[in-house]
Curated annotation (Swiss-Prot):
This is Palmitoyltransferase ERF2. It is an enzyme of class 2 (transferase). The gene is ERF2. Pfam families: DHHC (PF01529). It is a multi-pass membrane protein.
Amino acid sequence: MASKPDDDGFLAPYVSRSDAQRPLSIVSSRMTDIASEDGDGPEVQNNRLSIPQSTDMGSRPDTARTGASSSRGPWQSQSLRNKTYLAGVQAKRGSVESSTAGSTSQPPSLSSRSHVPSLQSHAFFRPMSSQKLQAQRGGSHRPSTMSQMSAAASPSSPTSPTSPTSPRSDEHGESSSSQMRQSIISNPIAQLQRQMSNEENMRPPPSRGTEMTEQETLDRITANTSPSHGHYPAGSLTDSVRPLQGMSSDTGHFQHSIIVDKSYKDLSNLPSPIKTPRSFRSSFLMPGRSNDGQLSQNRSTEGAEKLSSAASSPQFRPVDSHNEQQHPRVPYKPSQKSDLGRVHQYFDGNTVFCLGGRWQNTRGRPINIATGIFVVVPCALFFGFEAPWLWNNVSPAIPIVFAYLAYICFSSFIHASVTDPGILPRNLHQFPPVDDDDDPLQLSPPTTDWALIKSAESTTAAMEVPVKHCRTCNIWRPPRAHHCRLCDNCIETHDHHCVWLNNCVGKRNYRYFFTFVTSATVLAAYLIATSLTQILLYRNRQGISFGQAVDHFRVPFALVFLGFITFLYPAALMGYHIFLMARGETTREYMNSHKFAKKERFRAFSQASVFKNFIVVLCRPRQPTYYQFKAHYHEGDQRLGIRRDKRPRSSSQGLEMHDVNPGSSGFQGPVSLRNDTPH
């Protein structure tokens, strides 16, 4: 049946009348679910009822647009479609029940099963989600397919109400077959299952509104080498689609239903995954055994952090309500591991810790103890021999000020000596290990690079500073960071290693170091002033000579010389670091700059202002440590090494104290012959 083309319809496709089986159309399975909502007149409905129903699957009926255009003009159909579209938009703004009711009001027609439906359908403007589509299918009567219409028109069962292909109605007037898809032939997967299985109880084809419409999912379904009616895609359905694949207890057929009960615990419909040719083995990426029977690793795990994981998921089994009562579930309690110690016990640097990792110092000669003695002894002599006389004869403010300066000096000394100067974490940028088969003449990876630093000076916009890779710490050091050979650590913004503190001076303790040097200088000058004041006041009040006054106050006179000695070195350090801070440089940067000519010396980190340089150094926030030495150790931390008490101890004796095995005797030429020759 053909229709002439007009402005409002499409040409009817050419229909082959041969008996040869045509290939399946996947497009039809996607497009036939969209019901046409054009307003059809009475004459169009009569034309639909008068269409002969043929059982030939190779033929294809005319589309609704072609049939409608042959019976009515373009202007009439255009006005009817506009009215229908306005009515459809109002119905779309309602709930799902409104759309369901609208779909059940029209009888089954060929327009709802055409390959080219109405272009003004609701589905093109407001497509449904997979959940709403499943709900609509479960509650509405789906239109019959061509196979059902052919079976209904066949003379074998013209009046059979219980035909296998005819829908069965319950007492509420709803079709029970709407929960199962009737269009088996429109889906190629279902047809394949129908051809390979003769049973009627077969799983319904996957929904068109779910992820099964994707091509890659279709490939996963057909990947099994031995498909059967019980085959299902292993692990390809999402959790929102799995509850839809259920079996009805009344009919014994698979049906689509939405289970919204939160207490759903029946796992009988969730079988275990089936192994396919594309499945990975259970020991994938796990260390296996080599030919000699020893464990071998397919990748290096050195420096890797071991993450905790839960046990493997067991296979799903049917859960019975009686079994749940007999065997109640026990809440899972993670196993508590024994205390592995603190972080500082696994640290690889040349650092000694005390007070649980709160204090740290370089493992070497404790010269800082002598520095502390030089601070404590003069202060103790002052409070023992000068403070009482000054408190009673001059003013109590003098001993109080001295006590405050002594507190600042000693406190800053402790902080600068036992504080983390800014130790950078280790083993963050490890180079790949060198194999024995590698070419020894091959160039190694570069260990130097350049970093671009924005300059605050108006003459230059940016400057490049060198950065290096530390082979000892296995990290790329940031700008201004250096490795200290005494501490055996990379220090951030490293200034120098102070032997008087027995610790490095870096970004985290530079402020304490400068405070200690400055307060020690001021304290030494204050000690000299108070000692001389006490001697001179006693001489004037007693009317005696200076020698007699010194003979009366011998300790204050000794403190004058001690204060002068302790004043020189701290004063020099204080002036030097004031000069460095004003320039925006560190001690290491200033020393290295003298390797170049004056024209090539640049200060990349200067703020172009003396005041700003002081603010940046002295008023910057003190960042936390990278290691947290007081924290508990977690197994697999790549920054740390072996625990100190479990490390192999190196012998303190030299090589000459051990027995040296003689080398293998071989041909040594004339020397051996000359030694054996008798003289």
